[in-house]
Amino acid sequence: IGDVVELKDENRVFVKHGLESITNTDRPGLQALIKNSGLTGKTVSSTNVSFTIVPRINAVGRLGLSEKSVSLLLTEDYDEAAEISSQLCVDNSERQEIERDILEKIDGIIRRKPSLVNDKIIVIDGENWHQGVIGLIAAKVKEAYGKPAIVISKLGDIAKGSGRSVEGFPLCNAVFACSDLLTHRG
């Protein structure tokens, strides 16, 4: 439920029991995160987890600070958990600001060169865009224009990108078709 994948078969059972466990958790880290997410006293749903809890946990990983989430989930001390959880909320806000900044730059690029969105796939790049969020940005560009999108961050002589596709266009096949131009792919 923290990623965009089809939920079926036994995975539905895992999610159901997982949500019940989160709602009734005695883990200080989850309790603090639930409180800081405004979910205290509420039944934790897949929507709550997807849009409030997971982004806070993932934000620090995207910013290169994943040990914070690990510490939050492992601590036995509620005061420490509350402090870490508060920091995760700050870090999530920072991640959102980084995303907004890049999206504004992309909007500016497209306004200056509207032909970028006329191709079958949108490929857009910028200098030193945060690599931890370019996948999220690619998803937003794809949603905005209804086309596959690749967002690339250029760091000196190296460029790293992330793409998102629409149904019916296997983006990974397109990437593999140009693998001779790439140093790495995944």
Predicted segments — roles?
Residues I1-R185:
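Hydrophobic helix-and-loop "lid/oligomerization" segment in the mid-to-C-terminal part
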